[in-house]
């Protein structure tokens, strides 16, 4: 077996957090602008509480504070993408872990919606937000895994770069069909997780 462990991004690779943002914001376009604003506030920035980032991101795009509190209260409602419940049980022979930009509390709530994992490494615990390599490395250290024996399932282009810089091979579930990053290359790119099984079994 080439890999002994598989890591996952949580909020894009496993869960459809975009639809939750859209539902709370009152529309897909508004929700995606909120999501993007929140991402821009944490990416490459010093760590600060994730909940504050969500609140500030709402303000950036003109969404009222009460909506941010509603989103945080409904965090556990983010549902797995349709193929996730079929794929994850077939990976039980691997150590499975998550690396997420969530806080400890929100990470635990959201991960429970996705499945069962050996570790949920949050940005709060690592003291840095992805794509900084520290959260990925913290997960590897916590599970005493060698990076070359781990495949990471990225949810975003930034995740591809972050996980690659931490030394892992990357499978990219490019659900948004966005352009490939310029700083790293996934060993396989698909629109969902179905290609993951083919790759591991091939």
Where would I find each of the regions flagged by the language model?
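Asp-based, Mg2+/Mn2+-dependent phosphohydrolase catalytic module
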Residues: 1-6, 85, 89, 97-202
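Short glycine/proline-enriched coil/turn segments at helix->beta-strand junctions
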Residues: 26-29, 62-67, 91-95, 114-116, ...
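Serine/threonine-rich low-complexity intrinsically disordered regions
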Residues: 24-27, 49, 64, 92, ...
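N-terminal helical cap/lid subdomain that shapes the substrate entry/recognition surface
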Residues: 2-82, 103, 107
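Alpha-helix boundary recognition
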Residues: 35, 76, 89-92, 201
